[in-house]
Amino acid sequence: MNIRIGTRGSILAIAQTLEIKNLLNRYFPEISVQIVKIKTSGDINNQVPLSAIGGKSLFIKEIEEALLMGKVDLAVHSVKDIPAFYCEGLIIPCVLKRNSPYDVFISSKHKDIKSLPLNATIGTSSVRRKVQLNYLRPDLQVVPVRGNIDTRILKANVGEFDGIVLAEAGLIRINRCDVIKEILSPKIMLSAVGQGAIGIQCRVDDHSIINKIKVLNCHQSYVCVMAERSFLKTINGSCDTPLAALAQYVNNDTIHMSCMLANEKNMVFASCCFNECDAEKSGINMGKKLMDELSQYY
């Protein structure tokens, strides 16, 4: 049997896909695993803000098309890049054990965000990060930055920005933790939905593949990601919606989740604890609660 894995060709995407390939080889040594690099619209249009050209779905569109056409058997995605609703006929039955869900601050000049001078320039194209940075430091000038991780690190190192904010998990996966100056607490920078998690997507009727990749699934990571994605779906959030959610187990079956939703003028937060069997329902309830609270500011 041969399994073809569809993935983007970036350094980070290949690192994530190799992790899946190695796991499949470990569990199923008799199977041949092939990596198929697919260039996505998000990779091609890497100088334009995502919100201006179609959002996060641009990072998975061509890969999902390859899946549906049978050109690949499964796809590997950063869960935070998966939009609220993806192609009919596909399923994500597996989430690997989650890496760090936190954001980090990188700078060639400053040790942390607190030490940045007045009106310092921070690079990030994430509206989620922008609203939280401006809530923390209204003086900061937050400007867009696109490109792969190495490109963004280089821009920080040559002084194009006073600092940038990136996901810690990506830096861990490409062995670039040396550039981290500060790991940002979720109290000041709440994570993107699914941040730090790798999801495996396949065709909903491909039961042979589904049964195989389920052995790679981390139950707790999957449940937390589904709770966060229920929040995302309820809001129908996209890459230009300032929202955040982080669900984490506090014991064997109890989860704590914090969520944020914002508009141009206001930001609202909420948190709750729930049993894992209520994960998706709790995500829906949190979404409704924050939408209702935010609507009261208009």
Swiss-Prot record:
UniProt catalytic activity: 4 porphobilinogen + H2O = hydroxymethylbilane + 4 NH4(+)
Gene Ontology, cellular component aspect: cytoplasm
The keyword Transferase appears for this protein: yes
Keyword tags: Porphyrin biosynthesis, Transferase
Required cofactor(s): dipyrromethane
Swiss-Prot/TrEMBL GO biological process terms: protoporphyrinogen IX biosynthetic process
S-(dipyrrolylmethanemethyl)cysteine sites (modified residues): 239
InterPro entries: HemC, Porphobilin_deaminase_cofac_BS, Porphobilin_deaminase_N, Porphobilinogen_deaminase_C, Porphobilinogen_deaminase_C_sf
Cofactor note: Binds 1 dipyrromethane group covalently.
HAMAP family: Porphobil_deam
Family (UniProt): Belongs to the HMBS family.
Function of the molecule: Tetrapolymerization of the monopyrrole PBG into the hydroxymethylbilane pre-uroporphyrinogen in several discrete steps.
Subunit structure: Monomer.
Note: The porphobilinogen subunits are added to the dipyrromethane group.
Protein name per UniProt: Porphobilinogen deaminase
Encoding gene (name): hemC
